[in-house]
Amino acid sequence: LMLAYNSSSLAGLLTNTKEAVPESRWGLFFEPNFIVGNRSTTVNRTGYGFTTAGFTMGADYRVWDNLLVGLATGYNYTDAGFNGSGGLVQNNSWPITAYAAYLPETFYIFGSLGYTLNLFDLQRTIAFGGITRNAKSSPTGNQLNAYGEAGYDLKLKPLVVTPTMSLAYTSFGLQGFT
């Protein structure tokens, strides 16, 4: 489910009329997410389960007819654990991303630069002989992302083929813990 808005009035969302409404240079979006997964334990592997929930929202502005700039942020919560005493991890993450798109007639260029703060809670049960202990930690993670993409429209009537090229960079650092 993605909700987006790019108009000068919310009234157009409530009717089926096709009235000409001047288009706003501002756009807003909101996208919730929810993912659940698991894998059963077998002879060769430990099973696990996870849940992720959150949202992304943002706004962009059309500077010119072919130039768009924007800012997006959000929140995600992840809870994952291994079956048995394999441990668990919980993560609260807050991303922020700036982006721009140049969209002339036959090609486009898109780029983004982002940062995500990750706050982890980790737990693992350690059993040795008759002694059982829980190891716990709450490290912080910092993530930087950069992305660039370009594409060109090849108009092959009646088709339009758009070859693209992209480059992505991600750096993740996790605070030390004992």
Language-model-derived ranges and their functions:
Residues 1-161:
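Outer membrane beta-barrel translocator domains of Type V secretion systems
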